Amino acid sequence: MPKLAVVLLVLLILPLSYFDAAGGQAVQGDWRGNRLARDLQRGGRDDESECIINTRDSPWGRCCRTRMCGSMCCPRNGCTCVYHWRRGHGCSCPG
Protein backbone atom coordinates (compact mmCIF):
# COMPACT_ATOMS: atom_id res chain seq x y z
CA MET A 1 0.00 0.00 0.00
CA PRO A 2 1.44 3.40 -0.88
CA LYS A 3 2.15 5.85 1.94
CA LEU A 4 -0.60 8.23 0.87
CA ALA A 5 -3.21 5.47 0.99
CA VAL A 6 -2.11 4.47 4.50
CA VAL A 7 -2.29 8.08 5.70
CA LEU A 8 -5.77 8.52 4.22
CA LEU A 9 -6.92 5.26 5.80
CA VAL A 10 -5.66 6.36 9.22
CA LEU A 11 -7.35 9.75 8.84
CA LEU A 12 -10.63 8.01 8.03
CA ILE A 13 -10.44 5.58 10.97
CA LEU A 14 -9.11 8.02 13.60
CA PRO A 15 -12.34 10.05 14.03
CA LEU A 16 -14.27 6.86 14.83
CA SER A 17 -12.67 6.77 18.29
CA TYR A 18 -14.55 9.97 19.14
CA PHE A 19 -17.91 8.24 18.91
CA ASP A 20 -19.36 5.61 21.22
CA ALA A 21 -21.03 2.37 20.12
CA ALA A 22 -24.50 3.93 20.19
CA GLY A 23 -23.46 6.45 17.58
CA GLY A 24 -23.38 9.51 19.82
CA GLN A 25 -20.39 11.64 20.49
CA ALA A 26 -18.29 10.38 23.38
CA VAL A 27 -17.32 12.75 26.15
CA GLN A 28 -13.59 13.40 25.97
CA GLY A 29 -13.13 15.57 29.09
CA ASP A 30 -9.90 17.08 30.31
CA TRP A 31 -6.83 15.42 31.84
CA ARG A 32 -8.43 15.28 35.29
CA GLY A 33 -11.50 13.52 33.93
CA ASN A 34 -14.68 15.47 33.60
CA ARG A 35 -17.07 13.52 35.86
CA LEU A 36 -19.95 15.96 35.57
CA ALA A 37 -19.83 15.85 31.77
CA ARG A 38 -19.82 12.03 31.85
CA ASP A 39 -22.79 12.00 34.26
CA LEU A 40 -24.70 14.40 32.03
CA GLN A 41 -23.86 12.25 28.99
CA ARG A 42 -25.28 9.17 30.77
CA GLY A 43 -28.69 10.75 31.22
CA GLY A 44 -28.51 12.95 34.30
CA ARG A 45 -29.55 15.88 32.15
CA ASP A 46 -32.34 16.82 34.56
CA ASP A 47 -29.79 17.63 37.30
CA GLU A 48 -29.70 21.40 37.51
CA SER A 49 -26.24 22.81 37.95
CA GLU A 50 -24.85 26.31 38.14
CA CYS A 51 -22.34 26.97 35.40
CA ILE A 52 -19.79 29.47 34.22
CA ILE A 53 -20.31 29.26 30.48
CA ASN A 54 -16.96 30.60 29.27
CA THR A 55 -13.60 30.56 30.97
CA ARG A 56 -10.74 32.77 29.79
CA ASP A 57 -8.79 31.39 26.81
CA SER A 58 -10.73 28.13 26.90
CA PRO A 59 -13.75 26.79 25.04
CA TRP A 60 -14.77 24.84 28.16
CA GLY A 61 -17.17 25.99 30.84
CA ARG A 62 -17.38 24.83 34.42
CA CYS A 63 -20.47 23.47 36.15
CA CYS A 64 -21.16 22.76 39.81
CA ARG A 65 -23.50 20.23 41.36
CA THR A 66 -23.73 22.69 44.26
CA ARG A 67 -23.62 26.51 44.24
CA MET A 68 -21.18 28.27 41.94
CA CYS A 69 -19.22 30.94 43.82
CA GLY A 70 -16.82 33.09 41.83
CA SER A 71 -14.82 30.54 39.85
CA MET A 72 -15.20 27.68 42.36
CA CYS A 73 -17.86 25.24 43.50
CA CYS A 74 -19.13 25.25 47.08
CA PRO A 75 -18.38 22.00 48.97
CA ARG A 76 -22.02 21.03 49.55
CA ASN A 77 -25.62 22.05 48.98
CA GLY A 78 -27.15 24.76 51.16
CA CYS A 79 -24.15 27.09 51.01
CA THR A 80 -24.34 30.75 50.07
CA CYS A 81 -21.74 32.70 48.17
CA VAL A 82 -20.33 35.71 50.01
CA TYR A 83 -17.74 38.30 49.07
CA HIS A 84 -14.92 38.95 51.55
CA TRP A 85 -13.18 42.29 51.10
CA ARG A 86 -9.61 41.75 49.83
CA ARG A 87 -10.10 37.97 49.79
CA GLY A 88 -12.71 37.60 47.05
CA HIS A 89 -15.63 35.21 46.91
CA GLY A 90 -16.10 32.33 49.31
CA CYS A 91 -18.77 29.85 50.36
CA SER A 92 -20.59 30.22 53.64
CA CYS A 93 -22.02 26.84 54.65
CA PRO A 94 -24.35 26.05 57.57
CA GLY A 95 -23.16 23.90 60.44
Curated annotation (Swiss-Prot):
Signal peptide from the UniProt entry: 1-24
Positions bearing 4-carboxyglutamate: E48, E50
Domain of life according to the entry: Eukaryota
Residues modified as Proline amide: P94
Annotated S-S bridges: C64-C73, C69-C81, C74-C91, C79-C93
One GO CC annotation: host cell postsynaptic membrane
Subcellular location: Secreted
Tissue: Expressed by the venom duct.
More info: [desGly-95]VxXXB is a minor form.
Subunit structure: Homodimer. Pseudo-homodimer (identical sequence, different post-translational modifications).
Record comment regarding domains: The cysteine framework is XX (C-CC-C-CC-C-C-C-C). Displays a mini-granulin fold, a structure composed of two short, stacked beta-hairpins connected by two parallel disulfide bonds. This newly described fold is derived from the same cysteine connectivity as knottins (ICK fold). The name 'mini-granulin fold' comes from the structural homology with the N-terminal region of the human granulin.
Family label: Belongs to the conotoxin D superfamily.
Record protein name field: Alpha-conotoxin VxXXB
